[in-house]
Amino acid sequence: IEMCYASGIRLVTPDKLNPLYASSYGTGMLMKRSLDEGAKKIILGMGGSATVDGGMGILRALGIKFLTADEKEIIYPKELISLVTIDTSDIDKRLLECEVVVLCDVQNFLLGKEGAAAIFGPQKGATPEMVIALDQGLKNFSEVVSRSIGIDMATVSSGGTAGGAAAGLFAFIDAKLVNGIEYFLDLVDFDTAIKN
């Protein structure tokens, strides 16, 4: 599954890019469809996303609910600052029997000056003010996840890939994060081909 074709920059005209509202939900729907078709392994390419939602959209499509203090469901990245509770009771159980491999094109962490919002937010249409808001939202998301399931999304290498989606999938569905080009070179046994 190529995230750029489901939740990508290429799908939105530059004047319509707005990472405060852009969601990775469509990518999650494709993953769900793959599970419907019986997939036991999903390889997810994460380049070119229009999103900075920490993978919340993908995870929502797979059954996870993100809630405010008054139990209102969070839909947009701009609302992550209000996240208090994460309900995983309805997560798609088929994920337990499916290996998810995330092909990452960067090594950036989720937060801070080298994080998902600061480095990649501007190319997705974020103003400096939006970058601050998105980073604060992702920080809150990371803290709630750490308290809830004991995984620190902020320390995951390549977790900043695709607006933090890599970190979210690592935390909730035990996705394996790998270097995209290295994965494909291994897949085609490139080293052997070069020797021959």
Locate the predicted segments by residue:
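N-terminal loops that bind phosphate or other acidic moieties
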Residues: 1-46, 50-196
